[in-house]
């Protein structure tokens, strides 16, 4: 019999953890579907989804089953060997997308790191060492490793860690003329989020992505889509590129891919993938049997008309109610996004106060996010039911009313 867990409290974070986070005052201890309970037993409705991660809510039966069954078989073998869940997952991702090859990692940052390394390696092998420059959008977010944080182009994340990486240029998002002016035959890749998440939940314009694809083709550059947040059903298609009809050369996935279990994936073509030959890149835990089994189960549930069509319908339910709240209280001037990745942009009077909205919402037992100090973000479970949406938005409206009225 195992010993009982020692009691911990929020203050223990400040005592023992590196202070790079500022977590909420309460500690979630249990979740079921779109509801979470804290240490005191208080129940909250989850519109945050672990930052667009818990795509099927908490403790989804299919994911619990996959994890517990795999846990009784084998946990880890390293990439000296392969394993059955990883191969099944890779095959299903290939069957469902443009891709012909898959690299499995542990996170979105790792998937992006692999994507950026592959883009440079491919260009080096095919065109020569002078073709290494990467163009990305300003206010992007691609991860926290030194390479990915430099590609992201947000000084608040990249400053203070030594010299910035050379060969990385940032241009305004959705500005095709700026991209056209920046790209050259030295460009190895253009890296874009189909929807900027941390940048404020900004969807790409159709002409922008189409133009980026054309420019990449003209300059023999690879088009890389970071779909860590927008992928795996989040927008009502399995991946956002399918909504736009613009096919990338490399795509990164994570977050919803594991439904709450850590996993990332880089998807690409066979012609490009062959340039990551044996020993050029790797990961000890990437594609481990536990993570792969859970991700396979998540993919099976998400990639169905019932779930994907439901995401589109739920978007309209959220949007219409949030627009009414914005008009009633004068706090939001735009509701934007796609599917169940939604941003409520604050009015001039409330700009910079997204954290205040989050804190007010928590007091009314609903969990939301921010996507900058000016935007409140919603990224709930893809299978949240209408009753929970309505109840959660009622709580959210109470929070907004109290905040606005002081």
UniProtKB/Swiss-Prot annotation:
Cofactor note as given: Binds 1 pyridoxal phosphate per subunit.
GO biological process annotation, one example: arginine catabolic process
Binding site for pyridoxal 5'-phosphate: 108-109, 141, 226-229, 284
Pathway(s) the chain acts in: Amino-acid biosynthesis; L-arginine biosynthesis; N(2)-acetyl-L-ornithine from L-glutamate: step 4/4; Amino-acid degradation; L-arginine degradation via AST pathway; L-glutamate and succinate from L-arginine: step 3/5
N6-(pyridoxal phosphate)lysine PTM sites in chain numbering: 255
GO terms under cellular component: cytoplasm
UniProt-recorded name of the protein: Succinylornithine transaminase/acetylornithine aminotransferase
Source organism of the structure: Pseudomonas aeruginosa (strain ATCC 15692 / DSM 22644 / CIP 104116 / JCM 14847 / LMG 12228 / 1C / PRS 101 / PAO1)
Organism phylogeny: Bacteria, Pseudomonadati, Pseudomonadota, Gammaproteobacteria, Pseudomonadales
